[in-house]
Amino acid sequence: VIISGGGCAQPKLGSDGSALRLLTNLGCPATPFAPALTQIITDSAPIKGLSGIRVKAQVAVIDRKSVLHEEDGELLFADYGVSGVCVMQCARYAKEGRMLRVSLVKGMGFADAGEFRRELHHRRKNWAQRPMAELLTGLCVPRLSAALMRQADWRVTESSLCGQMTADMAERLTQTADAWLLPIRGVKGFESAQVTSGGAAVADF
């Protein structure tokens, strides 16, 4: 049996789901269509001001404590959430109530979170009189640095210095850079999706 009627992705090209309706009208079992290979919508507050920034990252969709799927590659921040090939590969698992875990430490050039933490303490000691806002200079762009510090609940002012960073602050920033959790609100619709998930239940043919 060959079924090649298309899904619902890119409806402007003619993919309107009519093949699935034909199958279900004939009594053939099918699973619901859903957008896949598309952008993920997240809470906008944690990523405010980051639109247009690209980073190397490892991303994973988390349901409670279970990792449903993970990828690594280039991530693109947007006003609505995140995009990039690695993100789009995770989209079929992204549902409201789940979390998108973003790890940036390897993309910054570190082997693991421990090495990132040690670099923070090295900079605290050697950059003691430099502004705290410059702590991540050379590791990420200033807008991303500020967002990570906000997410780690740092209170950075113009007078804050790198030497004032405490061990607890370093730990919170390390956890954020290694496992930044963004609440998922959904995915972009079929207009943005490259493919469709769901369709004819092949196990029943």
Regions found by a protein language model. Give the residues of each.
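An anion/pyrophosphate-binding glycine-rich loop and adjacent beta-alpha core
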Residues: 28-32, 38-167
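A short secondary-structure junction signal
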Residues: 13-15, 88
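Glycine-rich nucleotide phosphate-binding loop and flanking beta-alpha elements
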Residues: 8-10, 84, 94, 204
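General beta-strand structural signal in soluble alpha/beta enzymes
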Residues: 3, 30-33, 186-189
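Gly/Ser/Thr-rich active-site loops/lids in small-molecule metabolic enzymes
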Residues: 19-30
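A glycine-rich dinucleotide-binding beta-alpha-beta segment and adjacent secondary-structure elements
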Residues: 147-205
